[in-house]
Amino acid sequence: MAMQKAKEIVNSESVVVFSKTYCPYCVRVKELLQQLGAKFKAVELDTESDGSQIQSGLAEWTGQRTVPNVFIGGNHIGGCDATSNLHKDGKLVPLLTEAGAIAGKTATTSA
């Protein structure tokens, strides 16, 4: 049931960060996404009544029990290191743009 709820959340938004309010790695990922101008949904598992069940469902689904647990365009990205590495490699913004999370950053041709 919790895995199904996690999947529904992931499928309802272009970018989802499963997080905990006190986690410094979660804060880092959310700040990075904000700096890039990305729209995202943060699900704070420590404030959700069924947060621990959702976290268990995520672990069963993705093999990752830790937070942050990042999804872009319905695809599991991973945690803080994976997200930061994508950004360092220049791959995060294109993923966010493709998912529709960054408005006005689509490829345009000048006339």
Swiss-Prot record:
Q: For this UniProt entry, which segments traverse the membrane?
A: none
Q: Which PROSITE patterns match?
A: GLUTAREDOXIN_1, GLUTAREDOXIN_2
From the Swiss-Prot or TrEMBL record, state where the protein is found: Cytoplasm
The name of this protein is Glutaredoxin-C2
Q: Keywords on this record?
A: Cytoplasm, Disulfide bond, Electron transport, Redox-active center, Transport
The family assignment reads: Belongs to the glutaredoxin family. CPYC subfamily.
Name the domain of life: Eukaryota
GO CC annotation terms, alphabetical: cytoplasm
Q: What does this protein do?
A: Has a glutathione-disulfide oxidoreductase activity in the presence of NADPH and glutathione reductase. Reduces low molecular weight disulfides and proteins.
Q: Which InterPro entries match?
A: GLR_AS (IPR011767), Glutaredoxin (IPR002109), Glutaredoxin_euk/vir (IPR011899), Glutaredoxin_subgr (IPR014025), Thioredoxin-like_sf (IPR036249)
Domain named Glutaredoxin: which ranges? Answer: 3-103
Please tell me whether the keyword Transport is annotated for this protein: yes
Q: Disulfide pairs?
A: 23-26
NCBIfam families, alphabetically? Answer: GRX_euk
The record's principal subcellular location, in a coarse class, is cytoplasm
State the species of origin: Arabidopsis thaliana (Mouse-ear cress)
